[in-house]
Amino acid sequence: MAPMKSLVLAMCALVALAPGVDAAPKKKFHFELTAVIPKPEVKADVAKSAQPRVEAQVKQAFEKHPQLVPNLEGAPDPLKNADAYRKFLTRRGVTGSYLVTVEITEASEELVPMEDKGSSQRLVVHVGIHMLGETIPGRTMGFTGDGQATVKQEVGMKLRDRDRQYAWDSAAEVAVADALKTCFARLELPQKKP
């Protein structure tokens, strides 16, 4: 057993001392939010809670995500001069620019009694979203991505507004992050040539 420990320690030392291989820099993109739309299957009262929360989390992610360039100040109008716009993106190191529509495909809120705690209950919030990106300029399909999250939060017998807001914000944040991860994975794939 001792020789095996020595071998493992030696391997760990070699790995730690080996020069690190730098990963290729991640591609940069520009996303513009066009709309956050609840699907008809989502109940109206739940959509009323989900839509502003999801929209706020999407806007925040588009501003802060390291792979996204939030502002393209000085960019030519893509509708009037598409070639100049594409050249501008290349000079700024932006791989692509997209109009993004977010659909809320699933949303639910449920209060569940906790059997082991008589004075508490659990708030369960579920959010599922679908992102669709269309290229700027041209409005051809660029990517899709799906994300979902379920948050379970212990609350008292009376549900406070801030508990509900926290649960919706948390679920929306995780669902948006999940969808963006899927989008970026698809955007990193080599493009098929027609």
Language model regions located:
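Beta-strand elements of well-folded, non-transmembrane domains
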Residues: 35-39, 62, 106-108, 129-137, ...
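C-terminal/domain-edge helix-coil "capping" segments
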Residues: 23-28, 132-194
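Surface-exposed short loop/turn segments
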Residues: 84-140
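Bacterial N-terminal signal peptides that target proteins for export
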Residues: 1-9
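Bacterial N-terminal signal peptides
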Residues: 9-16
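Second-shell loop/turn segments in exported
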Residues: 38-49, 118, 158-169
